[in-house]
């Protein structure tokens, strides 16, 4: 669908620029509408994804749909399950940013792992609130795999505090160190939050490191291509 209007919901303000640039580099020639609500993430951290957050996610998604979005991407993994619930209540495609990454992680781990052990996926996050939603998403994909897959999760201590304090360099260093350590045992490494993606740049590892922005953007564009002209 040429010239499609894309809607994106973020909980980290900087990701609006990240995804805008990413989508424009693909040659997307339609409007891109961004909504930012940092309170969704702070609420999820404080008390989980409760009914209030679910209602707010639905409100934002409905607003984007009413504003003419042909497809919607929510770029926060911590609220992914609320996104799936909202998707069933609007008339346009609504995608969670980490779904494509989860599919790829399990497929790559199964492909790369030696035959004498289970495939291993390492999940890194800077926020504990993200590990539950991402872990459950991965486990749902693991259930369909044709061999055992182990998922190990870890929070990168200090990285979130550094980022919230404006110290992106320390955030990236801590995440980079955690990626390097995880590569010793994992067949695939998953960075659970889109805000972690920059920390993987420049690392020279034999293990694939998957981030959600590219996969999420590709899935969004694929969704609009399937829409009638």
Please describe what each predicted stretch is.
Residues 1-229:
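Non-catalytic structural scaffold of enzyme domains
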């Amino acid at each position: 669908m040429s010239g499609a209007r894309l809607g994106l919901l973020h909980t980290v303000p900087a990701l609006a620029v990240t995804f805008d640039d990413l989508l424009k580099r693909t040659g997307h020639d339609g409007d891109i509408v961004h909504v930012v609500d940092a309170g969704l993430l702070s609420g999820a951290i404080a008390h989980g994804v409760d009914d209030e957050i679910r209602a707010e996610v639905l409100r934002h998604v409905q607003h984007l749909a009413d504003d003419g979005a042909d497809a919607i991407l929510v770029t926060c993994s911590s609220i992914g399950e609320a996104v799936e619930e909202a998707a069933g209540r609007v008339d346009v495609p609504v995608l969670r940013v980490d779904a494509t990454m989860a599919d790829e992680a399990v497929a790559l781990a199964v492909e790369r792992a030696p035959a004498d052990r289970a495939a291993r996926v390492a999940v890194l996050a800077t926020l504990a609130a993200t590990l539950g939603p991402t872990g459950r998403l991965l486990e749902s994909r693991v259930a369909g795999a044709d061999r055992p897959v182990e998922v190990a999760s870890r929070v990168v201590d200090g990285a979130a505090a550094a980022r919230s304090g404006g110290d992106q360099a320390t955030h990236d260093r801590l995440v980079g160190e955690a990626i390097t350590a995880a590569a010793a045992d994992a067949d695939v490494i998953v960075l659970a939050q889109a805000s972690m993606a920059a920390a993987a740049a420049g690392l020279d590892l034999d293990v694939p490191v998957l981030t959600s922005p590219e996969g999420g953007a590709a899935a969004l564009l694929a969704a609009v291509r399937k829409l009638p002209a």
